[in-house]
Amino acid sequence: TAYNTAMGYNAGVGITTGTDNTLIGGLAGDALTTGSLNVAIGRSALGADDVGNRNVAIGYACLQSQNFSTSTDSYNTAMGYGAGSSVTTGIENTLIGSLAGDALTDADFNIAIGWGALGADTKGNKSVAIGTGALDAQNFTTSTDAFNTAVGHGAGGAVTTGKFNTFLGAVSGAVFTTGEKNVAVGTYALDRDTQGSRSVAVGYQALTNQN
């Protein structure tokens, strides 16, 4: 039994043997053929994938580029206008907020929550960005385990290729670009250094003048 639900112009129009899909909106999941257990709500949500499984795309163009060549349990979740809109073969990403992770392509295991969070990266893996503009400049052009964590408005917002950083607090580590292995906890902590490494700053404006 199929248990598919489709509402909207050409929603799920290509499904052949896929099951348990919920597709709501014009062209939502319109390329799915054998993909199963997907939820796509919004125009063109999950609109290119034909064999992917277990995805949630809620919002205009969410996961619209995802497309696996073989049946794959990808476990991607994207919610918000354009969230994850460039993901092609990345797996296990959670992208919530308008344009969150919207440049990611084949990156894996990322969490981006907030407008534009992790919005420039294409191939970085295993980063957590929570807050408007958090890690929104990070961009690895080859598959890289970045292990950056940024929580707070603009936290780590200038990081490009730095790795192993933890920024907790609004604007913490805000101008870091390539610095690595730093910890900044507190609003404005370590917010002027650009390339330093192995520093720990805890408290409001801690190490704010280090550069």
For the regions a protein language model found, what residue spans apply to each?
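Glycine- and small/polar-enriched repetitive beta-structure motifs of secreted/surface proteins
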Residues: T1-N211
